[in-house]
Amino acid sequence: MDAVFHSVNKLLENSFRDNWDRPALSNYQGTTLSYGALAYRIAAMHVVFEKCGLKHGDKVAICARNHSNWAVSLLSSLTYGAIPVPLLHEFKPGNIHYLVNHSESKVLFVDSVIWEGLVPEEMPDVQVVVNIDPFKILYARTEEQKYVQGHIIELFGQKYPAYFGPEHLDYYEDTADELALVSYTSGTSGFSKGVMISYGAIWSNMYLASVAEPQVKAGCEVVAMLPSAHMFGMMFELFYEMVAGCHVYFLTRLPSPKVILKALADIRPCMVICVPLIFEKIYKSKLKPVIDKNKFFFMIPGLNKALEKKIRDELYSSLGGNFEEVILGGAAFNPEVELFLHKIGFPYTVGYGMTECAPIITYAHWDKIKPLSCGRVAPNMEIRIDSPDPRTIPGEVQARGMNVFLGYYKNEDATAKSFTEDGWLRTGDMGVIDDDGFLFLKGRSKCMILGPSGQNIYPEELEAVLNSLRQVVDSLVIDDHGVLTALIYPDWHQASIEGIDPEKLKEQFMQMLPEVNRQLPSYAQIRKIEFMPEDFERTPKKSIKRYLYQR
């Protein structure tokens, strides 16, 4: 890619035309769409949009599990000039209703499981609801819109009477500062923020990928295992691959280590992108036992190198054996695992970013990365550390540049609080930068917890559910070494009046926990409860001093 902005939709258009007969999207162990077939489906969806009255700039919400047709829905919306609003499929129906309404979406793409829990009357702005597998209009508000469902082939034929080919592609031409999509960081009213991502931010992230991963080109195969609605997965398992002419496989099932390893062995991708949890599980189940068993041999010169090479080769082979490097991001990486991978010379790298930067802030190729760092600042970006000595004293990481978001949708106050007075994005992360420009993160200044697959978990949301229970005075949710734990200050006085001892009270809470978790996304399930003998330490404003309880 050139180092100068080009319309993202025109880049997609050119790629579709150039790779017309190549495979584009597949469901793992399922159907495959060529770039030509993908373009055909997009054109058909554009006809549906036109006939249903969708205009450029209207919002299109997408809430479904990972699937090739999820990508078709997103690309159809983007290339039409609409604004996609990807939503995590784990959100509860009430959350989906809220976000669809908050975003003022006119069209909603869903899968059949999501649709079962939704009530169209709760989403008054929505004109049409479309099932993604198979594509079918499930709900239409007007008779004219209902007519479209039974006449799509006829309407498509009217627009393309002879045939549909590469020369018919003419996608919406975007500009760098224009709003491309809205990505919600949460599903709950009062906590959700619609991150407005520009086309320039998407292009800039794709440009980084083209420079950092030149081996990713037309015909390369990639496995999409991250959540499609997550900015990390959307950018580096879909957008860039479509511009590069790659073949993307969607797992369409829970990405357990077993499923992922089987898919990687079958597909043999040119690049592996995943969250650290996958590697940590592989390390604990397969590598750690070997290391512990051979500790003596690791101390013998010559033998240790042979063992390291054997482990490296076996790990490389188990991940398909055809990739340039493994890119990890979306959550913190266990230092023990990372240092071992570095020691054996395994080709991995760790990037750093956030939804508000679409998502990349720093990155380095595996042969340049420093252990425990997150790389160096990405092209078109700058970072600084708010610290008297950025090399030794941790301070907030602040960023500015092309990747930075336009603001939070309909939330000027939150937008203003996200930037410094001189216009730098406040990331909420603490870090230092060494003399070579490598960023080392030291912790988070925000309350947000990163889930195992990179989802944003806001403890205040979970606490709001807990605090609604009659027996709870106040609560605090923490990440206890990967386990979401609720610290609860119960109503000891009321329990005493009712003759309930601590053990009985704990038993009652454990019985209520499944009902609490039913109100929360699958990635934000509370697994452990601990009682506080007395109230939490508080600030003068009566807020809990969270930092005292972190582990």
Which residues fall in each region the model found?
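Structural core segment of the AMP-binding/adenylate-forming
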Residues: 52, 79, 83-158, 482
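Gly/Ser/Thr-rich phosphate-binding loop
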Residues: 270-273, 284-369, 473
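Conserved C-terminal "lid"/linker of ANL adenylate-forming enzymes
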Residues: 449, 474, 482, 512-551
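Conserved AMP-binding/adenylation subdomain of ANL enzymes
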Residues: 203-221, 228-312
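Conserved ATP-binding/catalytic segment of the ANL
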Residues: 391-392, 396-451, 468
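Conserved AMP-binding/adenylate-forming core of the ANL superfamily
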Residues: 4, 13, 21-67, 71, ...
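Conserved pre-ATP/AMP-binding loop-to-beta segment of ANL
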Residues: 20, 150-184, 191, 215-221
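Conserved AMP-binding A3 loop
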Residues: 34-36, 180-206
